[in-house]
Amino acid sequence: DVCDSLVGGRCIHNGCWCERSAPHGNCCNTSGCTATFWCPGTLFD
């Protein structure tokens, strides 16, 4: 559920990517759309 630079900046266990400008905040989903969810506990969790 957290962003981890050790895994390429991906959010662990929720299938989205972290934005570089918000490494612990907003994520992008797999289709490239910006999601307004915080990394921990997203819909993808």
Swiss-Prot record:
Tissue: Expressed by the venom duct.
Post-translational modification 6'-bromotryptophan, affected residues: 17, 38
One of the record's GO molecular function terms: toxin activity
Sorted UniProt keywords: Bromination, Disulfide bond, Hydroxylation, Ion channel impairing toxin, Neurotoxin, Secreted, Toxin
Residues with the 4-hydroxyproline modification: 23, 40
Domain of life, source organism: Eukaryota
GO cellular component: extracellular region
Subcellular location field: Secreted
Covalent S-S links between cysteines: 3-16, 11-28, 18-33, 27-39
Function: Mu-conotoxins block voltage-gated sodium channels. This toxin reversibly blocks voltage-gated sodium channel in cephalopods, with no alteration in the voltage dependence of sodium conductance or on the kinetics of inactivation.
Domain notes: The cysteine framework is XII (C-C-C-C-CC-C-C).
Protein name: Mu-conotoxin-like Cal 12.1.2e
Species, as recorded: Californiconus californicus
Source lineage: Eukaryota, Metazoa, Spiralia, Lophotrochozoa, Mollusca
